[in-house]
Amino acid sequence: EDGKEIMHPGYVAKEPPKSYWNLAGAMYAYIYTETAKMGIDVLGESQLVGFPSQFPSVSMMDYNTTEPNARFWILKLLKDNFGLGDKLVETTNPSSSLAAQAFETRHGKILLVINKRNREQQITLPEETDGASVSLVAPSTGDHAPAEQTLHGHPLSRQPFEVAVVQYE
Protein backbone atom coordinates (compact mmCIF):
# COMPACT_ATOMS: atom_id res chain seq x y z
CA GLU A 1 0.00 0.00 0.00
CA ASP A 2 2.54 2.47 -1.19
CA GLY A 3 0.31 4.60 -3.42
CA LYS A 4 1.89 3.34 -6.64
CA GLU A 5 -1.16 1.24 -7.52
CA ILE A 6 -3.10 4.44 -8.21
CA MET A 7 -0.52 5.85 -10.61
CA HIS A 8 0.57 2.60 -12.25
CA PRO A 9 -2.24 0.33 -13.48
CA GLY A 10 -1.43 -3.33 -12.89
CA TYR A 11 1.05 -2.58 -10.11
CA VAL A 12 0.65 -4.88 -7.11
CA ALA A 13 1.91 -3.66 -3.74
CA LYS A 14 3.73 -6.08 -1.44
CA GLU A 15 1.71 -7.82 1.24
CA PRO A 16 2.40 -6.49 4.74
CA PRO A 17 4.31 -8.87 7.01
CA LYS A 18 2.10 -11.23 9.06
CA SER A 19 3.14 -9.47 12.29
CA TYR A 20 1.56 -6.26 10.96
CA TRP A 21 -1.95 -7.52 11.76
CA ASN A 22 -0.99 -8.24 15.37
CA LEU A 23 0.69 -4.83 15.64
CA ALA A 24 -2.40 -3.07 14.26
CA GLY A 25 -4.67 -5.00 16.62
CA ALA A 26 -2.45 -4.37 19.64
CA MET A 27 -2.41 -0.67 18.81
CA TYR A 28 -6.22 -0.66 18.70
CA ALA A 29 -6.43 -2.46 22.06
CA TYR A 30 -4.02 0.08 23.54
CA ILE A 31 -6.11 2.95 22.18
CA TYR A 32 -9.17 1.28 23.73
CA THR A 33 -7.56 1.29 27.20
CA GLU A 34 -6.40 4.88 26.88
CA THR A 35 -9.78 6.18 25.67
CA ALA A 36 -11.56 4.22 28.43
CA LYS A 37 -9.42 6.15 30.93
CA MET A 38 -10.74 9.36 29.33
CA GLY A 39 -14.35 8.21 29.70
CA ILE A 40 -14.88 7.64 25.97
CA ASP A 41 -17.44 4.86 25.46
CA VAL A 42 -17.40 4.23 21.71
CA LEU A 43 -14.64 3.56 19.19
CA GLY A 44 -14.75 2.55 15.56
CA GLU A 45 -12.41 0.43 13.51
CA SER A 46 -12.06 0.54 9.73
CA GLN A 47 -12.70 -1.52 7.55
CA LEU A 48 -14.11 -5.03 7.27
CA VAL A 49 -12.69 -5.89 3.83
CA GLY A 50 -10.11 -3.82 1.98
CA PHE A 51 -9.01 -4.86 -1.48
CA PRO A 52 -5.64 -3.74 -2.91
CA SER A 53 -7.23 -0.67 -4.45
CA GLN A 54 -9.01 0.19 -1.18
CA PHE A 55 -6.31 0.39 1.52
CA PRO A 56 -6.02 -3.29 2.50
CA SER A 57 -3.82 -2.37 5.48
CA VAL A 58 -6.90 -1.35 7.47
CA SER A 59 -8.90 -4.47 6.63
CA MET A 60 -10.14 -6.95 9.23
CA MET A 61 -10.38 -9.74 6.64
CA ASP A 62 -7.86 -11.29 4.29
CA TYR A 63 -9.31 -10.45 0.88
CA ASN A 64 -7.59 -13.52 -0.64
CA THR A 65 -9.04 -16.08 1.78
CA THR A 66 -12.06 -14.19 3.19
CA GLU A 67 -10.86 -15.24 6.66
CA PRO A 68 -10.67 -12.80 9.59
CA ASN A 69 -7.20 -11.55 10.54
CA ALA A 70 -5.72 -10.63 13.94
CA ARG A 71 -7.27 -7.13 13.78
CA PHE A 72 -10.72 -8.73 13.59
CA TRP A 73 -10.06 -11.21 16.38
CA ILE A 74 -8.69 -8.53 18.72
CA LEU A 75 -11.71 -6.31 18.07
CA LYS A 76 -14.00 -9.29 18.78
CA LEU A 77 -12.04 -10.06 21.95
CA LEU A 78 -12.62 -6.50 23.15
CA LYS A 79 -16.29 -6.48 22.11
CA ASP A 80 -17.02 -9.80 23.82
CA ASN A 81 -15.35 -8.87 27.10
CA PHE A 82 -15.81 -5.13 27.64
CA GLY A 83 -18.68 -2.69 27.36
CA LEU A 84 -20.71 0.14 28.80
CA GLY A 85 -20.72 0.30 32.57
CA ASP A 86 -17.33 -1.36 33.02
CA LYS A 87 -15.29 0.19 35.81
CA LEU A 88 -11.58 0.79 35.52
CA VAL A 89 -9.52 -0.50 38.42
CA GLU A 90 -6.27 1.19 39.41
CA THR A 91 -3.56 -0.82 37.67
CA THR A 92 0.21 -0.65 37.87
CA ASN A 93 1.95 -1.20 34.55
CA PRO A 94 5.03 -3.36 35.05
CA SER A 95 7.06 -1.84 32.21
CA SER A 96 6.83 0.57 29.31
CA SER A 97 6.83 -2.45 26.97
CA LEU A 98 3.52 -3.72 28.31
CA ALA A 99 0.14 -2.12 28.86
CA ALA A 100 -2.12 -3.60 31.50
CA GLN A 101 -5.53 -2.37 32.61
CA ALA A 102 -7.90 -4.06 35.04
CA PHE A 103 -11.67 -3.70 34.73
CA GLU A 104 -14.70 -4.77 36.73
CA THR A 105 -17.17 -5.90 34.08
CA ARG A 106 -20.50 -7.69 33.81
CA HIS A 107 -18.34 -10.84 33.32
CA GLY A 108 -16.34 -10.25 36.52
CA LYS A 109 -12.78 -9.04 36.96
CA ILE A 110 -10.82 -8.79 33.73
CA LEU A 111 -7.24 -7.74 33.08
CA LEU A 112 -6.37 -6.59 29.56
CA VAL A 113 -2.66 -7.12 28.81
CA ILE A 114 -1.01 -5.77 25.66
CA ASN A 115 2.56 -6.43 24.58
CA LYS A 116 3.54 -3.20 22.83
CA ARG A 117 6.83 -4.57 21.51
CA ASN A 118 7.91 -6.82 18.64
CA ARG A 119 9.63 -9.19 21.04
CA GLU A 120 8.53 -11.49 23.83
CA GLN A 121 7.93 -9.86 27.22
CA GLN A 122 7.70 -11.30 30.72
CA ILE A 123 4.96 -10.23 33.10
CA THR A 124 4.23 -11.26 36.66
CA LEU A 125 0.53 -11.13 37.46
CA PRO A 126 -1.08 -10.89 40.90
CA GLU A 127 -1.53 -14.20 42.75
CA GLU A 128 -5.32 -13.84 42.50
CA THR A 129 -5.03 -14.53 38.75
CA ASP A 130 -3.61 -18.04 39.29
CA GLY A 131 -6.07 -20.46 37.67
CA ALA A 132 -7.66 -17.65 35.63
CA SER A 133 -8.79 -18.18 32.06
CA VAL A 134 -6.97 -16.31 29.32
CA SER A 135 -8.10 -15.56 25.77
CA LEU A 136 -5.32 -14.27 23.57
CA VAL A 137 -4.51 -13.18 20.05
CA ALA A 138 -0.82 -13.47 19.20
CA PRO A 139 1.44 -14.41 16.29
CA SER A 140 0.96 -18.07 17.28
CA THR A 141 -2.81 -17.82 16.70
CA GLY A 142 -2.33 -16.53 13.15
CA ASP A 143 -5.63 -15.67 11.50
CA HIS A 144 -7.57 -17.93 13.85
CA ALA A 145 -9.86 -17.35 16.82
CA PRO A 146 -8.24 -16.42 20.13
CA ALA A 147 -6.40 -19.20 21.95
CA GLU A 148 -7.70 -20.20 25.37
CA GLN A 149 -5.37 -20.96 28.29
CA THR A 150 -5.46 -21.38 32.04
CA LEU A 151 -2.85 -19.51 34.06
CA HIS A 152 -0.51 -21.57 36.22
CA GLY A 153 2.56 -20.00 37.74
CA HIS A 154 4.42 -16.78 37.23
CA PRO A 155 5.96 -14.99 35.40
CA LEU A 156 4.27 -15.32 32.04
CA SER A 157 5.73 -14.84 28.59
CA ARG A 158 3.72 -12.68 26.21
CA GLN A 159 4.38 -12.95 22.49
CA PRO A 160 5.19 -9.95 20.28
CA PHE A 161 2.13 -7.66 19.95
CA GLU A 162 -0.01 -10.11 21.90
CA VAL A 163 -3.35 -9.00 23.31
CA ALA A 164 -4.62 -11.09 26.22
CA VAL A 165 -7.79 -10.95 28.29
CA VAL A 166 -7.36 -12.52 31.74
CA GLN A 167 -10.66 -13.30 33.46
CA TYR A 168 -10.36 -14.03 37.18
CA GLU A 169 -12.28 -14.06 40.48
Task: List the model feature ranges, each with a label.
Residues E128-D143:
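Solvent-exposed beta-hairpin/edge-strand motifs
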Residues G83-V89, G131, F161:
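Glycine-centered loop/turn motifs
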Residues T35, L75, L111, V134, ...:
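Hydrophobic, well-ordered secondary-structure elements that form the walls
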Residues G44-L48, V113-N115, L125-E127, A138, ...:
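Active-site proximal loops enriched in glycine and acidic residues that flank catalytic Cys/His/Asp
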Residues T105, A138-P139, T150:
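Acidic surface patches and DE-rich sequence motifs
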Residues A147-E169:
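C-terminal beta-strand-rich structural cap/linker in extracellular carbohydrate-active enzymes
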Residues P94-D130:
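Carbohydrate-binding surface patches
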Residues E1-K76, D80, L88-L98:
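Aromatic/acidic polysaccharide-binding cleft in carbohydrate-active enzymes
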